[in-house]
């Protein structure tokens, strides 16, 4: 299988500890809502076109997760949920975690998705390639 690069520069699929996953780099956007939303939409289209089920980790470090950004994130997740067995999120504040978890549970297609929050991307990737939820 050949490696491709996503709009954000991530290799697809990304090999890690004997497994494969996909990483979205949505960090370092600061308060630039338009920038992070634009990247999200481009990554969504890319991921759907790959037609492959992979654990997904998303880096939100140094990006302000406004209500609008979180809403767009939930919408993106609903569109790609059939391709994601597990979701690891990195760089979310306590309040961001609370908001995201609440909205994921409200979503019919996302409520059963295994989601974990991490401070370290390596921990997120290790969990995603493990057999355990």
Residue ranges and their predicted role:
Residues 2-133:
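Amphipathic, Lys/Arg-enriched alpha-helical "gate/interface" segment within cytosolic domains
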